[in-house]
Swiss-Prot record:
Keywords: Membrane, mRNA transport, Nuclear pore complex, Nucleus, Protein transport, Translocation, Transmembrane, Transmembrane helix, Transport. This is Nucleoporin pom152. It comes from Schizosaccharomyces pombe (strain 972 / ATCC 24843) (Fission yeast). Disulfide bonds: none annotated. The chain crosses the membrane at residues 80-100. GO terms for cellular component: nuclear envelope; nuclear membrane; nuclear pore; nuclear pore transmembrane ring.
Length: 1250
């Protein structure tokens, strides 16, 4: 009785229901039980069908009683609901299943005997005898020892090895001796045991073989990397620090098989570098001046051609420059090097390995330094021809520091990297006098010194060195031809007041100025006049003032003054020797009258006490001439017209040296008048005049003013008709005579008087002007066509410029300033303005023709995919930027969209890489050419002073094509077919391209694996009929592939293995051969014949004179011989060839003995090979030669060989060993063997397997 535990008392399952619920656990338990019972039945059937009769049934019984008991005992331990039985129930279940097992083992024998008795009649089989009637084969004796051994050939996936699978390029830094690179070697479907690679030195081409095996290789494999997505691939890395070409030579895997090596290579070169060769030692910066040209030199090292990118900071902006196609002189790289993809460069295609050596190239970088400050050049990237690139990000950060105000003057100039170049551009100094000129001289007092003020806009901290020349007074400052009296050099600081002290009068001229680094420019005014002013003096003459009626009414003191106005005179008037206050009067005239008109009568003394002027202090006067005593007891008058109102202030006029001047004087009184006046120059009396006039308005003519100084015209006295002469006390007229007339001249710091600039630029011709602003300058311009034009300019700066926009010759014609006409110092002086030439290009290596304004250059035609380039020579001021358009017109006359490209270089030659990807005609139209002077100038070529647009034409021919027309067709030939007959099959090949063609064809024998190549030349047809070669008519299947086709253009195309191939099958004509060469047979044995061809076969033979017809669906015709006799085989035909083969003479044969054969000495051998390799299968015979045998290749199975894939029969073996080479996977077994007399097997079962 089966009992279950109540649900309320049932314990929880061993596996919690939260993980697997109870129904699912029951399902799993029942499933295991069913599986055990099913396997029990299978085990029973296997036991009963075993050929080993003495296997005991007790073993089966004990085994399954134990298995069932274990299962039933363990089941309650899981406490599965509804399957959790009590121990008593479990014991009962074990007993029941033990009884069932006993019943099965005891009843099985009877059951199989009864089944066998029913099925036996159906398995009995009869065979045909030689007389074509069926007989019982029980008389056939089985002897398995006659054929021993089995050869299993497994073709493993083809193991491959490839160095540098990603086609990377490697480089080593020449400065780092401890640097290594990791060369990748990738293995596919294999594990290496031995590696041999070669290293070719780039300099000497010396090849060194290196072997890696044992512990070294195991260490590399342990650190190898695998791709999770491609587990068959494994990559190891070889460390090396030697430059050169690396290739794999030999690889052996763990099966001791050679591994196929892909054609690949790894190149290790020196990393490209770029340093500035013109750096000063210690990395110190160079010193330059504004306007200088800095000639830096960049040393580039690496595999040419190289590309260099550098940036520079000019104090305000960053500029990026790219230098393309940097190559050494006389450098002619292989065409493939010009490919845009460095991975196209492979040295096994015939490129000289020494081309990969490093070249050292010096590239000039010429820069016009336009602004002061620190200029920085930094290399940011260098790339060589192989794609190796060195970047310098730290240099970008270095440049950014300068953008934020850092300079090397801050103390880190010694830390400049080698690929950073620095030049400090200093401001050029200038110098001029301030507050002193020819017109405004400086005063030098006796026994003293005076300070001359200098001005400079120079803003640097460095001191200036100023050269000053002194000339004697009296020379013309504008035309000094004598040597200076002295030359002195002064050190001044431009950031503070700059003064020089002089102790001698003269003409001081600034001759030069320079700073610590730069020469400078002397600006106007550059001349300072230093004079010693005269001491203040006065002469006094007293005259009584009398009236005709009243007599003396006072006195007049006439003061004649010498010195520098204004004058201050101290005087006093005393009466009767009584003291009185001192009075002062100030005047800027050289003559002055003091009128003493006492109001009261008395005895008076008029005293002139002292004098002072603008330069000298107060000086007391003494002597009788400076006072007058008088006892005091209208008049004729004259004044300058400007002071008719009685104003006593001085009249100031300006005149030019060498001019005259008229001064109107108004006379009062009774005509006629006698007027006396005096002329003073530089406060010294020069001449005195007395004139008569009847007109109250008299014009006083001043003589020619031949000296550049100050003239004072003083009215001394006037007398009218009454005879009363009166001394005058009226205002003077001062005439300031300019010491020089304005002058103009061109200025050139280098005395070339030539300006060169880009066409259309605004240029400034420097002038030097003397005089007072503004200046009115007239000049002429003569063009290149001798056309003359006149122009006028108004200028306000003595260091002005003429702003011009046209080239030609400029000549100064006249100059005048605010008051005087002037002169041109050198009327023959001319200034030349020239345009710098525009850049242009030339292509001397190509033939050209002209059509209109375009010159067409013809580049040699190439084939699609080939490398091509042409050289363009550039003329101008580098660096250059060349722009061109590429237009393709393909073979169908379709015009592709225009593609624009740019090439930059600092050299005068640039290589333009041609595009050959798509067949057609390429037009390379050069549109713009820029250099350092001109931007986007038209790119032209100049021939015989004519400009043309340059267009390069190149035809790219398409690659020829070849393909089989009937790829699905199987071409079948009999082994003895004459392929030269007109009815022989031909293989049609379609050809495309320019005829005649050359074709390379490969024919592979699939049985032997051998490949034969045939080259067919001078093919003119577009459809070529290929005759299969007679020598290739060997048994088996053949694959005909197209390997390469070449057309009349010289273009060759390799045809990939993915393109369909033609399949050819060569079969034998139906043939018959006895399995053995005996004339006697063994009684009871079968008489068997090997049939060659495609079954079914029809065989005609005679037996004891009776003609028989036999058919066979296999390659073996077997008949049991029940009677002695002679068998004569007459003819045979098969299904494949449909031709009947007559056997002449007929084959007569008798079976006599049974031979034996052993494969690989009778052992079961398993050998592994790679795809493409061959294995050797050996067969050893016993018996009487000659031997013949048949063997089969079966498919590989998991436990036993699979179906038969092919069979072969070999006859005429006179040796006891026979070897077969095969590259086809399968299990090779012998089916039959025959010697001179007998064959084996003899029974029909064996025959059916042959």
């Amino acid at each position: 009785m089966v009992t279950r535990v109540a649900s309320s008392e049932r314990p929880r399952p061993l596996v919690p229901e939260s993980i697997v619920d109870a129904p699912t656990q029951r399902l799993y338990a029942i499933g295991v039980f069913v599986a055990l019972q099913a396997y029990k039945i299978y085990d029973l059937l296997k036991l009963e069908t075993s050929s080993i009769s003495d296997v005991p049934k007790s073993g089966f019984l004990v085994k399954w009683i134990i298995i069932d008991a274990i299962y039933l005992r363990l089941l309650p331990k899981f406490r599965i609901p509804w399957l959790s039985f009590q121990p008593a129930a479990t014991l009962l279940q074990i007993a029941i299943f033990a009884a069932i097992n006993l019943l099965l083992s005891s009843l099985s024998s009877l059951k199989w005997i009864s089944i066998g008795s029913i099925l036996l009649p159906y398995f009995k089989k009869k065979e045909l005898s030689i007389s074509e009637h069926k007989i019982n084969p029980n008389n056939v004796i089985h002897n398995s020892s006659r054929i021993l051994g089995q050869y299993t050939l497994q073709v493993l996936p083809e193991g491959t090895a490839k160095i540098n699978p990603l086609h990377e390029n490697y480089c080593l830094n020449s400065l780092r001796k401890d640097q290594y690179v990791d060369l990748a070697i990738q293995f596919n479907s294999t594990i290496p045991k031995y590696i041999q690679y070669s290293h070719v030195d780039l300099e000497t081409k010396e090849e060194t073989l290196v072997e890696v095996s044992g512990r070294s290789l195991r260490k590399l494999l342990s650190s190898s990397s695998k791709n999770p997505k491609e587990p068959r691939l494994q990559t190891i890395y070889l460390k090396t620090n030697k430059r050169g070409l690396y290739t794999l030579k030999h690889v052996v895997d763990k099966s001791k098989l050679d591994v196929r090596i892909f054609r690949s290579e790894a190149v290790v070169v020196s990393c490209p570098t770029a340093t500035f060769a013109s750096r000063q030692s210690g990395g110190r910066l160079r010193e330059r001046c504004v306007g200088d040209t800095d000639n830096a030199e960049l040393k580039v090292t690496g595999v040419a051609p190289l590309q260099v990118t550098y940036r520079n900071w000019d104090g305000k902006h960053f500029n990026t420059h790219i230098i393309d196609s940097t190559i050494p002189d006389d450098f002619h790289p292989p065409a493939v090097v010009l490919s845009s993809n460095p991975k196209d460069i492979v040295f096994y295609k015939g490129i000289d390995i020494q081309w990969a050596r490093s070249s050292e190239i010096f590239v000039p970088i010429n820069t016009l330094l336009k602004a002061p400050g620190q200029w920085i050049y930094a290399v940011t990237q260098v790339t060589d021809a192989l794609g190796n690139s060195q970047q310098f990000p730290s240099n970008d950060q270095f440049l950014l520091r300068f953008a934020h105000g850092y300079t090397e003057a801050d103390g880190e100039s010694h830390s400049l990297p080698e690929n950073v170049y620095s030049v400090f551009v200093h401001q050029r100094p200038d110098i001029q006098f301030r507050g002193c000129s020819i017109e405004s001289p400086a005063n030098l007092f006796p026994n003293k010194e005076t300070s001359l003020s200098l001005y400079s806009s120079f803003s640097e901290y460095n001191s200036l060195e100023v050269g000053v020349d002194r000339y004697e007074l009296g020379l013309d400052p504008q035309n000094i031809t004598v040597p200076p009296l002295s030359h002195k050099t002064y050190q001044i600081s431009p950031r503070s007041s700059a003064n020089i002290n002089v102790k001698k009068p003269g003409i001081y001229v600034l001759s030069s100025v320079s700073s610590q680094y730069c020469s400078g420019e002397v600006l106007e005014p550059n001349t300072c006049l230093v004079v010693t002013p005269p001491e203040a003096k006065v002469s006094v003459s007293f005259e009584e003032i009398s009236d005709q009626c009243a007599g003396s009414i006072g006195a007049r003191a006439d003061l004649e003054l010498e010195g520098t106005p204004p004058f201050t005179i101290a005087y006093r008037m005393t009466k009767d020797n009584e003291a009185s206050r001192i009075q002062y009067v100030t005047t800027d005239r050289t003559r002055y009258q003091l009128n003493f008109t006492p109001k009261k009568a008395g005895k008076y003394r008029y005293i002139i006490l002292g004098i002072q002027d603008a330069n000298y202090g107060y000086r007391e006067l003494s002597g009788s001439s400076f006072y007058k005593d008088q006892t005091v007891f209208p008049l004729a008058d004259a004044s300058f017209e400007e002071r008719r109102n009685g104003d006593l202030s001085t009249v100031v006029k300006t005149s030019c040296i060498g001019d005259t001047m008229s001064l109107p004087v108004l006379l009062t009184g009774s005509a006629p008048w006698t007027l006396e006046y005096e002329i003073f120059r530089n406060n010294k009396r020069e001449e005195s005049h007395v004139v008569e006039s009847k007109d109250p308005r008299y014009i006083l003519e001043v003589p020619m003013l031949v000296h550049g100084s100050q003239y004072t015209i003083t009215l001394v006295s006037v007398k009218d008709s009454n005879g009363c002469k009166r001394s005058l006390n009226t205002a003077d007229t001062v005439i300031k005579v300019r010491r020089q007339r304005p002058t103009a001249t061109f200025y050139s710091s280098d005395n070339t008087y030539t300006l060169k600039s880009v066409e259309g630029a605004l240029m400034k011709i420097p002038l030097r002007l003397a005089g007072e602003k503004p200046w009115y300058v007239e000049y002429s311009h003569t063009s290149g066509l001798n056309k003359v034009s006149h122009h006028k300019e108004v200028l306000n700066d003595p260091n002005s410029y003429l702003t011009v926009r046209k080239s030609g010759t400029y000549t100064l014609l006249s100059v005048s300033d605010s008051s005087c006409p002037g002169t041109i110092q050198n009327v023959e002086q001319k200034y030349q303005v020239e345009w710098l030439p525009r850049p242009f290009l030339s292509i001397p290596s190509l033939e050209s023709s002209v059509k209109g304004k375009t010159r067409y250059y013809e580049q040699n035609a190439v084939c699609a995919g080939d490398s091509s380039a042409f050289e363009v020579q550039l003329s101008g001021s580098g660096p250059f930027l060349l722009k061109h358009d590429k237009i393709l017109v393909d073979e169908k006359s379709k015009t592709y969209p225009k593609q624009k490209s740019e090439l930059s270089t600092v050299q005068n030659t640039v290589l333009v890489k041609a595009d050959t990807a798509v067949p057609g005609v390429y037009h390379y139209e050069f549109t713009k050419l820029s250099d350092s002077l001109y931007s986007d100038s038209d790119a032209v070529t100049i021939v015989n002073n004519q400009s043309y647009q340059a267009v390069v034409l190149q035809r790219v021919n398409s690659l020829p094509k070849a393909s089989f027309m009937n790829v699905e067709k199987l071409y079948t030939f009999c082994i003895n077919t004459d392929v030269t007959q007109s009815n022989a099959q031909l293989i049609a090949i379609q050809l495309q391209g320019a005829s005649p063609f050359s074709l390379v064809i490969g024919i592979k024998n699939e049985l032997t694996g051998s490949v034969s190549k045939y080259t067919l030349n001078d093919i003119h047809e577009s459809v070529y009929k290929f005759a299969f070669p007679q020598e290739q008519l060997t048994l088996g299947k053949h694959v005909v592939r197209l390997l390469q086709v070449r057309d009349a253009n010289g273009c060759a195309a390799s045809i990939t293995k993915t393109q369909p191939a033609a399949k050819v099958s060569v079969v034998e004509m139906a043939s018959l051969a006895p399995l053995g060469s005996r004339q006697y047979y063994c009684v009871g044995d079968r008489l068997s014949f090997a049939l060659q061809g495609l079954p079914p076969f029809d065989v005609e033979y005679e037996f004891n004179g009776v003609t028989q017809h036999a058919t066979s669906d296999s390659h073996i015709l077997t008949r049991l011989i029940e009677l002695p006799g002679v068998v004569a085989m007459k003819s045979i035909s098969d299904h494949g060839s449909h031709c009947k083969s007559y056997i002449n003479p007929p084959i007569e044969q008798i079976v006599h003995d049974i031979p034996t054969v052993r494969i690989s000495n009778g052992k079961d051998v398993i050998e592994n090979i790679h795809e493409g390799d061959q294995a050797e299968i050996s067969f050893h015979f016993t018996g009487t030669p000659p031997f013949s045998f048949s063997y089969a290749r079966r498919a590989l199975g998991k436990k036993r060989p699979g179906k038969v894939l092919e069979t072969h029969t070999v006859t005429g073996i006179n040796e006891y060993e026979y070897k077969v080479l095969s590259s086809v996977e399968g299990v090779y077994t012998v089916l039959s063997v025959q010697d001179k007399y007998c064959r084996y097997p003899q029974d029909s079962t064996s025959s059916s397997n042959i």
